[in-house]
Amino acid sequence: MDGFIVVDKSAGMTSHDVVSAVRRIAGQKKVGHTGTLDPFATGVLPVALGEATKAIPFLDESIKEYRAVMKLGVATDTQDYTGKVLHESDWSHVTTSALNEICRMFVGKLSQVPPMFSALKQNGVPLYKLARQGAEVPRQPREIEIYSLVIEAVNLPEVAFTVRCSRGTYVRTLANDIGGKLGCGAHLLQLHRSLSGPFSINNAITLDDWARRMQDGRAGETLVSPFAALSHLKDFILTGKGAAKVANGVVPALEDFQVLSECELLRDELVRMSFGGTLLAVAKAGLPGDWKMLKNLKLSRVFNLDNSFT
């Protein structure tokens, strides 16, 4: 099978656990995930099978969406409920109005210091390993962007919210920082990813359900094709002759395309090359120019998804 399965991850599983389960259920070795979710988190975890693994570097997962619940008054070393309590503070002064006001301060571009309990590495060692040894090392702030932050429900000391943010945002740290601004501390109780780029919870499936579909011969119905996963790229549709060229790693000529959109290509812009709705290659524009400058395209990756070119 070749495609992406959008796994609705259950709590307690690591991202590696999910990949191992998909590999076992599908009975194939070529499997990889596009990002990670904390073990306590649930929701969208895209997993690539077969030729879809080649598409991972070209995905646009710049926008993520999460639904979360934080608890005010308690700060932990992991910034979630699994960690050691660092301090407890009174939260009785917090009002819904104050919550909304503080949350508005976090919308926009921000510098966020990654947590010690993260997979980021320092001198080749994951930070979480250093943290488990009791070490605290300086971390460089990273620029992130919060596109929206909405308080969904307030049942103090618990607060439910939805956040849409850039890739690389730590929602645990966001909750911790909101708690700091409120003067009482906070940590995450729940984290559920509902969106990761083109992959939505609306198209997600649990591993148990997918295993049942595999037994029924319907597992392929749930897969997102590499072509669909790269829908953010301009699409150049090949003729059968052009498709055969691309399959052999040859850059097609102008006459090898069925449809060419009137469009400008930027330097290093990536485009799809397809035939019959199947992704055959991702190519890169070597020079800026209009769509007729196809001689400047270079094949970045060829996909072996279809060889029935007519």
Swiss-Prot record:
Ordered alphabetically, the record's keywords are:
Isomerase, tRNA processing
Active site at which residues? 38 (nucleophile)
Stored Pfam families? TruB_C_2, TruB_N
Report the EC number(s), separated by commas if there are several.
5.4.99.25
* CDD domains (alphabetical): PseudoU_synth_EcTruB
User: Would I find Cell inner membrane among this entry's keywords?
Assistant: no
Task: Name the InterPro entries on file.
Answer: PsdUridine_synth_cat_dom_sf, PsdUridine_synth_N, tRNA_psdUridine_synth_TruB, TruB_C
Q: Which molecular function terms from Gene Ontology are attached?
A: RNA binding; tRNA pseudouridine(55) synthase activity
- GO biological process entries: tRNA pseudouridine synthesis
HAMAP family the record matches: TruB_bact (MF_01080)
Q: What family is this? A: Belongs to the pseudouridine synthase TruB family. Type 1 subfamily.
Protein name (Swiss-Prot/TrEMBL): tRNA pseudouridine synthase B
What organism is this sequence from? Answer: Geotalea uraniireducens (strain Rf4)
